[in-house]
């Protein structure tokens, strides 16, 4: 990897480009005097990055940006935002079985072993003691939209999410059949 380090009496920063878990990743770490550090990751393979960081092995591929604001000096408590594009959720039979009921394309990707594919994903997280609290989690694909909030405990390997799942194709058909709904939602005439 390649790194640049900057230090003065107000700020310390590290910027770098290297491989994290085999994924080319840009990293930026900043620490201002009298404040907690921030960290940014940008990668073309978010699955490999999340695996290397010890978060999950269940994401495959995907461009990903992770912005972290630490909330203590021990780096154990932080909030952040994760944005991802073009990724799959794999090896999660409970989630896959639930989603396959709503989406024919989901069934097709499960049979081929690719998991559930999403075009976009976004999550706001709060992490403390290996417990992730999601106050906003959005996932979307051509056929499926998910909005949720809840908790993920890495030590107990448990997840508790509440939210909604919508078959996007069905919503699109309803909007196209009833133009007034489309105008109401978009404001366009």
Predicted region positions:
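Membrane-proximal interfacial segments on either side of biological membranes
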Residues: 1-120, 124-132, 144-189
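Short, glycine-rich nucleotide/cofactor-binding loops
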Residues: 138-140
